[in-house]
A protein has these predicted regions:
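Outer-membrane beta-barrel "beta-signal"
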Residues: 118-121, 210, 274-288
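A short acidic, amphipathic alpha-helical/loop segment
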Residues: 77, 254-255, 279-281
Length: 288
């Protein structure tokens, strides 16, 4: 009967979308955040995330903006929130052999043959609402903070300098986040950060970043309410490089995530600077 069919549909959608809390944006660095802009949002204690992305090379360091990569490269990562105040991640970005290079064997030219490895850390310095209800959460973070200065040897370089340095994603930041809930509609997150970019083969900068996200929280058991509640929409203004690749500028990025099963399986997509598409998928497990 149609009544029974409606019951089964509600049960199915409840299992598919139910049980979700406010979804944290998953940055393309493989850490919690917006799309590229840092935030102070933390995952639940003992959360493990596994994911991968298809990345337009224009959003990366100039190292990837070469003919071998157009239009995309890829990354994959594992991320763990060890404590409520500490998140760590290990990310690998695929690398191709460079045409005409004496470093890369000829059979690797133009083929994915290696990967750039990077570590990422986020430390919560202040929890949202600790002092007053209006006080934001504060996080200190680092992406790809250190690498050997000479192609795997030599001293550790923390700043993206040296010809043999592989710090292609290096940046440091201080971020603050505040959430405002609209009952029966959703939750807005407001995020500001100061970002110091020191990536190898890229422009260096010390600039602010800002963004907002909106996670639907519609009341009701209908199909559309449950479907909408999977969306976490994002917009940000983030430091980056201009199209000449040598000038620091800002990019306006829009995108979001969509949870297709109880926050365990999530999709992410963005338009960087309104024209460069990247997308990915990540899986989330709560071990506690």
């Amino acid at each position: 009967s149609s009544a029974a069919s409606d019951v089964y549909k509600r049960q199915f959608l409840g299992g598919l979308f139910g049980g979700m809390n406010v979804i944290k944006g998953q940055a393309f660095y493989g850490t919690t955040g917006l799309l590229h802009a840092p935030t102070a949002v933390m995952q639940k204690d003992k959360t493990v995330m596994l994911g991968g992305n298809m990345l337009d090379v224009n959003i990366l360091s100039r190292y990837w903006v070469r003919s071998e990569y157009h239009p995309y490269t890829y990354n994959y990562y594992i991320n763990c929130t060890l404590f409520p105040w500490l998140e760590v991640a290990y990310t690998c970005t695929l690398v191709k052999g460079i045409h005409g290079s004496s470093y890369w064997p000829q059979q690797t030219w133009g083929r994915f043959t290696n990967q750039d490895r990077s570590f990422h850390f986020r430390l919560r310095a202040w929890k949202e609402g600790w002092w007053k209800a209006w006080t934001p959460q504060v996080v200190i973070g680092a992406n790809d903070p250190g690498s050997h200065s000479s192609n795997g040897g030599g001293d550790i370089d923390w700043g993206g300098g040296g010809s043999g340095n592989h710090n292609y994603l290096t940046r440091y930041y201080l971020a603050a986040t505040k959430h405002v809930e609209f009952s029966g509609i959703g939750t807005v997150g407001v995020h500001v950060a100061w970002v110091i970019g020191k990536a190898m083969s890229d422009v260096h900068y010390s600039r602010p970043a800002a963004g907002v996200n909106f996670h639907f929280g519609m009341k009701g058991e209908g199909f559309w309410q449950k479907a909408l509640n999977g969306f976490n929409l994002m917009a940000e203004v983030c430091p980056g490089h201009a199209e000449d690749l040598h000038t620091a500028t800002y990019t306006v990025n829009v995108g979001g995530t969509y949870s297709i099963w109880k926050d365990h399986i999530n999709l992410i997509a963005e338009l960087n600077d309104g024209k460069f598409f990247s997308g990915g998928i990540f899986f989330k497990l709560h071990l506690k």
